[in-house]
């Protein structure tokens, strides 16, 4: 194959020269081996095979494993088998290593052991066999480049103290150092072996290069030139042909940079030009023809890029690629390659220049977010690949063709480096988008395109080397940016790379090795990766993630097209000749530029690109500087149409990524299982419950996730506060209006008294609404109401009311007939409060039902029954509230304890009209005969319509009885007594027939009834005297034994937890008749038994007096008639009354116990048994309603519950608990402070003082004095019963802030120490310790 003089990428011949069999060859020469400075176990050893002509593997030891077992850089998974080093024995197995022979025996024993490593991932994994060149030198290496002479297989490597010419032999696969230009006295020989250790005389001074050493070789006529940084600011040019010790290889030195040089490059077309860039932000172009002296301090062109340090600068390459077509062979080249160059800067900007107009950059791209480190041009297209410290490799289009306007990218943002021309460009909308971005994950320091022609940019290969710890060179195909095509592993991190041709690539590493690979023999990453994978989508296993993709390739198949941006020619144009001047200095690019400078401007060139906006250069002779304030040339042609940012600047994708399919497999399976196999779910629940029983932690986590802890909804606090304030104002106005109206009809008082009454109304309303502790309490309000009711009953005969008493009670005002119309306004507010209470009850009932079902799912029947008990008790309260109707007469006539139970939760006793004495035998029945013990009660004491009907008829029938004088009986009373006597005789006869005996187990004394009569405020002294005059009944016969009845718990435990049918359960007379309505039930407080005893007395008149005294007020009170058992005993006046009152038993049914008392008992049981979840749940739901315990204890319990949630990583539930918690500052001091453990100074035990804390807390609860808790502290120890160290000055316990004197260690109060040292100006310790303690 004939090669063009400009062709750089010479191909390796298909057939290689065979190696002689009877010849022992090593990749390191014999002389080189003998001249090594060290010959220990880590040095190289020669392995001779008896019948082998092939070289052995290089190292006798395995290289250290610098990379992890699995690498995830760039998102590519590579098993260890694929990442095995090319230098490992297992990496070159005998069956695939062309350099090791499988037959024969070793003639000399050595330490080398060849091991084959089995691939556990894939049995078809290809091993690497592409490493064909490798050698190790004893000099530090930092840069490598190829010799652009097709007749010499040469490489140039440079380091801090080394500049060597190396030649590699494809025949014997060896690399040899031919000449070292830094050590001319070294005994180097091109015939045989080479020595890397220079034999210097003692007086010879060794030259050193710059620490940032870059090496480049020339092209064409300057192919024998080597450029290297001799020092930080100079470029030295050496001649490869002067390799003898007599000749001086140094041609010239170029030194005009004021700071360190980072990069330089030879022009492939105009080979006499060299460009350089450095830290001084200047680009300098040198013409080697004009710099023939040994040292040159002036460059031909100098471009100042303002403030950005230049990291890399490159000419556009000028490759000539030969191809065949219908007309024969032709050569493709780029006419612009001799003029264009690009630079990348510390700021991340990429600048493209045209040498014909150097005063203005053509393109400015913000390529990287951090410093840009390197760049490289595509061999035949106008693309530039850049690498930066941000770990990205970006591909940018920098062409000028009009059809690629969408690829034109402007400078955007604030540019601190270059001064852009004065134009009206709107940079805010201009954006820079690369055509392709490869995320490497490490800073990219070196990158090189494969020197091969490609019509499609995505079929190009790009070699990348990093500055990190990755001991590899990655070769990417732009068609696959996520998976590299080849990964070339080395012993140590790579420092540089160079392509010799399309197939051969060399690199150097930190281990001073030079390695060469044939990429055609290297396996691709896709060949060693699995073709599909399936994994769980998340940690909990909720779904599968499956990726399936064909193996594909690294190329994009497209029809072959002729390049549009290149011009077909037989020979690439060399230099630009000036026909008017034959001087070589005035020929070519530099000559044209100089001629242009001699005229008015830079427009003397014939432009080969669209006109761009140019700024006027400010230069002296040959120096150019980009000026920001200069006017532009050809302003008329400064068209900005091509600079308009496009909207679709998106990164192109050559190969579509694989399709990712996600399936919620567990959810699908659960749906199938629930629909077709329902019984399997029950088995799973049983297994889960059994596992939870064995693991308390899992049970706690499950309950914390499933239970409901709060019924509070999110709301706007400010809005609710405003609404409440408006309602309060309206309520106060209504009360004042009602009071004023009533005052007009009664006796008028002074204005001062009216103002005081208004203040009392406002105070009482605010206290009731917001629970203010000042000036009044709920008990005071209740007492005022009770006193008003009593005064009303006492003065019922006179009908005279005191105005202050009426105005102090809203209920008495609304009950008066004179304010009947105005009290309706208050009813609306009462109804709103009632609806709020009902809604709260409904929420609590739903939460209780849910919690019961949660406990039932894990077979925790104890807690299940507890929540069912709470739910049913709340259902009783809800039934009473919904069944009670708000009457216009007594809508606001509520007990104070009813509202307080709901709003403040005070433990108040319910006011009773007929108090009873405490008996010793009332333990069982006392909790069942309390009247309406629920906390949430209706806002009216008036019974429902169904209850009013029988009561009202009863009042009409007994109206005459109510007004009978108690002194003399009349005929009606005799008739009633006669009927009562006949009824009693009939029952006695029936009992006698049954053979039952009369028992006298129950005895009620007469003074019991006298005590009841004295407590009735409406009875007159005359009635009381007549009542005391009645004889004492000695015994009461029991007519019928008490029948067996079901308890409340037995009744409701048999119900289903899914619902509650209140009407059905209450309406069942056989099962759910309350004992207070049982006609013949016996209890210590039974009034039926007392009535039966009255019938047996001889004095019927006195018996009737007592009967009438009890019956009249009971029947006259519509509130207590249907609900008190006392009224039932007095209904035996006639059979008709008995029948009517029997209907009330079916309607009226009080709850068996008080809800507040029940929940308190459950809370105490939960705390005693250590049921944390139930305790916290009760506090969350009922603390603000019933005041289960003290607020501090509730907050402390919730805070500890939060710590438990954090301990078991239930952070979401803990956040919800804090969000919906009814209390503030739950965490208290633990939220922002750390706990400190204190140990006793005497006994050494941890000071907790829990026993004294409980004792003081109990004392504070009993006495109600919270100051008792101030005695508690950690200044004493419960274990040894002694105080800790006292103050050194006052000898009192140290309870608060403590100061310590450092020299002696004495402690004292802050105030005491302050007074001693600061106020009294003392310098010694108060304890008399020697030395100065404070200065």
Curated annotation (Swiss-Prot):
Question: What InterPro entries is this protein classified in?
Answer: WD40/YVTN_repeat-like_dom_sf (IPR015943), WD40_repeat_CS (IPR019775), WD40_repeat_dom_sf (IPR036322), WD40_rpt (IPR001680), WDR24 (IPR037590), WDR59_RTC1-like_RING_Znf (IPR049566), Znf_RING (IPR001841), Znf_RING/FYVE/PHD (IPR013083)
Q: Name one GO biological process term.
A: positive regulation of TORC1 signaling
Look up the record and report any one GO term of the cellular component aspect: vacuolar membrane
- List the CDD domains: mRING-H2-C3H3C2_Mio-like
Provide the protein's localization: Vacuole
Q: Which stretches does UniProt call biased (Basic and acidic residues)?
A: 945-956, 1009-1021
**Where primarily located?**
other
Which positions does the record annotate as the modified residue Phosphoserine?
1030, 1074, 1081, 1083, 1117, 1127
The entry's keywords: Metal-binding, Phosphoprotein, Repeat, Vacuole, WD repeat, Zinc, Zinc-finger
UniProt WD repeat ranges: 207-248, 256-296, 305-342, 367-406, 439-486, 489-527, 844-884, 1130-1170, 1217-1256
Map the zinc fingers (RING-type) to residue ranges: 1294-1335
Q: Where is the composition biased (Low complexity)?
A: 630-644, 808-817
Q: Output one GO MF annotation.
A: zinc ion binding
**The UniProt record lists the keyword Plastid:** no
A Pfam family the protein falls into: zf-RING_16
Task: Map out region (Disordered) in residue numbers.
Answer: 1-39, 559-593, 600-619, 630-651, 736-758, 783-824, 935-956, 1007-1037
SMART domains on file: WD40
Its annotated function is as follows: May be involved in a process influencing telomere capping.
Q: Which family does it belong to?
A: Belongs to the WD repeat RTC1 family.
PANTHER family reported in the protein's UniProt record? GATOR COMPLEX PROTEIN WDR24
Name assigned to this protein: Restriction of telomere capping protein 1
